[in-house]
Amino acid sequence: VEWTDFERATIKDIFSKLEYDVVGPATLARCLVVYPWTQRYFGKFGNLYNAAAIAQNAMVSKHGTTILNGLDRAVKNMDDITNTYAELSVLHSEKLHVDPDNFKLLADCLTIVVAARFGSAFTGEVQAAFQKFMAVVVSSLGKQYR
């Protein structure tokens, strides 16, 4: 993947301004509410009965933060995201058996959460860079499935 200077700077700027322990949980909670079938991967998380329960679930919060910290690894390794995520791809495909389409759903939820936080600063150009980054992440996580 070729990154322009603008794309690199934009991705680094976005992630430098995110509160991982707020945005991560909000993103995962949104995904679990909007796409309830994704809850099947989180059976050990306890009560996911409704949006309020999901939002207050400590395990959802913790895993959401873990996801954002995982994305931070991609930000720091933008030229080699595929290899950066090789082990995660194997884990999610072979051990956890996660449908790779769910990575795209989560990426879409993150885009919405980020857009809401950044407001008018999340211009079309910024969104294009962010979605390009997330598409590379999603592709890298799904690599083991091919």
UniProtKB/Swiss-Prot annotation:
Q: Which residues form the signal peptide?
A: none
* Entry's transmembrane regions: none
Instruction: List GO terms (cellular component aspect).
Output: blood microparticle; haptoglobin-hemoglobin complex; hemoglobin complex
Q: Name one GO biological process term.
A: hydrogen peroxide catabolic process
Q: Which Pfam families match?
A: Globin
Q: In which tissues is it expressed?
A: Red blood cells.
Q: Which residues form the Globin domain?
A: 2-146
* Homology family: Belongs to the globin family.
Does Membrane show up as a keyword for this record? no
What is this protein's record name?
Hemoglobin subunit beta-C
Keyword check for DNA repair, yes or no: no
Lineage, top ranks: Eukaryota, Metazoa, Chordata, Craniata, Vertebrata
The record makes one more remark, namely: This fish has three hemoglobins: Hb1 (major, about 65-70% of the total), Hb2 (about 5% of the total) and HbC (about 20-25% of the total).
Instruction: Spell out the CDD domains in the cross-references.
Output: Hb-beta-like
**Described purpose of this protein according to its UniProt entry:** Involved in oxygen transport from gills to the various peripheral tissues.
Q: Which organism is it from?
A: Trematomus newnesi (Dusky notothen)
